[in-house]
A protein has these predicted regions:
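Transition-metal
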Residues: 1-141, 201-233
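Short helix-capping and hinge/turn segments at secondary-structure transitions, especially at repeat
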Residues: 175, 194, 225-228
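Short, well-ordered, mixed-charge alpha-helical segments that flank or form enzyme active sites
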Residues: 107-108, 130-135, 141-146, 172-173, ...
Length: 233
């Protein structure tokens, strides 16, 4: 068999976001030198965390480099040079993720240097008994009321919270306010984008004592204000 026809293994890129835990190391034997380990980007050509080929003819190269050198791997009509249209990751939420929203493709293209927007799908690999997630609002919201609640820290009373169980599937369309809750372990398939507008972060600080930045104005540009969305697919 020619090397061109052989599959190859990938090493993931890791992310040490403050809400992560150890399950990706303990349950999946991920050998990444970071603590906590919040996410592993298993199949990625995104510049913020490309996967690295492990072994074989392409050992040590990024997946992006391989696909640029061999565009035939992407078929006859690749969308862009060396890039996959999706990104696949594992997520370990030891703590709640920030309340956030992602733009659609049109908004991201105009306001985020031509980036894709971000719709995503979560498959729940495991979840603690009391695990929940935020998915949209309890009822229709007015933009000014939402803005005020974000600025004064009362937004949680408007958020629709949903219990999470193993094998649940959730589709998070661009524009949907959402947050993965503590105790959930998920696999995510998403558009190849890292554009996130953080709306509320529970007044947390990072390991340096700094509050993480919020993106309220852009979030208000893209958020879907309709309430009572149906989360499960």
């Amino acid at each position: 068999m020619s090397w061109k026809n052989k599959p190859f293994l990938l090493k993931p890129a890791g992310k040490d976001y403050l809400w992560g835990g150890r399950r990706l190391k303990d349950d999946f034997s991920k050998e990444l030198d970071m603590e906590p380990l919040a996410e592993t980007w298993e199949c990625s050509t995104h510049p913020d965390g490309p996967s690295i080929v492990s072994g074989g003819a392409f050992d040590g190269k990024t997946l992006t480099e391989v696909l640029k050198a061999h565009p035939e791997y992407l078929g006859t009509h690749p969308r862009s040079e060396g890039e996959l249209p999706i990104l696949i990751k594992l997520i370990d939420a030891k703590q709640d993720l920030s309340v956030q929203v992602h733009p659609d493709d049109a908004y991201a293209k105009e306001h985020e240097n031509g980036s894709l927007g971000k719709s995503e799908l979560w498959y729940v690999l495991d979840a603690k008994k009391d695990a929940k997630l935020v998915y949209g609002f309890y009822h229709d919201m007015e933009k000014q009321v939402l803005k005020e609640s974000l600025l004064n820290g009362t937004v949680e009373k408007y958020l629709q919270k949903v219990s999470v169980q193993k094998d649940d599937v959730f589709y998070i369309e661009a524009g949907t306010v959402h947050a993965l809750g503590a105790g959930a372990l998920v696999a995510e398939i998403q558009e190849n984008s890292n554009v996130t507008y953080r709306m509320f972060d529970y007044n947390r600080v990072d390991k340096h004592g700094n509050a993480r930045p919020l993106h309220v104005d852009r979030a208000l540009d893209v958020v879907d204000l309709k309430g009572s969305a149906s989360p499960r697919q």
